[in-house]
């Protein structure tokens, strides 16, 4: 099994990890329901692309 010849410094490690960033989720306005929902997902009221495709989840 391969073993690193030298220890990776904190600076080298952090430079490598600069690309691991958290991005904000994309949110779209649904004109049918008047709510905001994430792209390519069913809204909380059961609409997708303006059509009703699922029953709305009830708060029990």
Curated annotation (Swiss-Prot):
Source superkingdom: Bacteria
Cellular component per GO, a single term: large ribosomal subunit
Keyword set, alphabetical order: Ribonucleoprotein, Ribosomal protein
Keyword Ribonucleoprotein: yes
NCBIfam families linked to this entry: rpmF_bact
Protein family membership: Belongs to the bacterial ribosomal protein bL32 family.
Full protein name: Large ribosomal subunit protein bL32
Organism: Streptococcus pneumoniae serotype 2 (strain D39 / NCTC 7466)
Classification lineage: Bacteria, Bacillati, Bacillota, Bacilli, Lactobacillales
């Amino acid at each position: 099994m391969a073993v690193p010849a030298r220890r990776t410094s904190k600076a080298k490690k952090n430079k490598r990890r600069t690309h691991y960033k958290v991005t904000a989720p994309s949110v779209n306005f649904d004109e049918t329901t008047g709510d905001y929902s994430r792209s390519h997902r069913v809204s909380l009221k059961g609409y997708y692309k303006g059509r009703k495709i699922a029953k709305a989840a009830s708060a029990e």
